[in-house]
Amino acid sequence: SWDGKVEDVNQLNKEGEIDKQLYLKATFNQTYSKFGGYIKTKKHNATGFFRTQNIDGKWWLIDPEGYKFWSTGITGAGKGNATKILNKEFLFTDLSNDKEASINLQNKKVFKRGGVNYYNLNLFRKYGSDWENIHEQVTIGRYKKWNINTFGAWSLAQKNPSIPYTLIVSTKKINIGNVEHTIDPFDSNFKIDLKNSLLTHKNKTNDP
């Protein structure tokens, strides 16, 4: 055993209440702007959007308020994988004995393709029926309290973004000699592929 090990569902529920007290109203500390930029550095032109700028020969990200931004993030935030239970349901007595859990299995984010996403199921047990919204807000609060200023790639999209996030922009991969499936920025079609990939995110145009 170890400190903090979850022993039963009741403990999950209690820890859910603690999470809400600790993180739902959390903010970045006073050295950060509301976007996670460093406010103790020289302020540059504030455009209202993230951008890049060469400062003393080095390229920096500048946040919408004009502060230098060093991205510190975690990839894959808020996701879980399914455990397959098809034809072996008898091994998962917690599901058959937990009426609420069984009902929640109708939620496709918990139960699909003959498997159970225990990550999401335990979030339901921890936070209740509004688990998706509470989990998002608790996660955002954790980031701010821990001074993590970026949702990295492959993270779940925030419904109301308050933490900067990254988007995945890909171009076609080609074979170059013995090197397979690589991106060639010197390929004549690279700019076209990049532009087309960026256009798939045009709904983010007005997001800082």
At which residue positions do the language-model features occur?
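Active-site-adjacent substrate/metal-binding segments within catalytic domains
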Residues: 4-163, 174-207
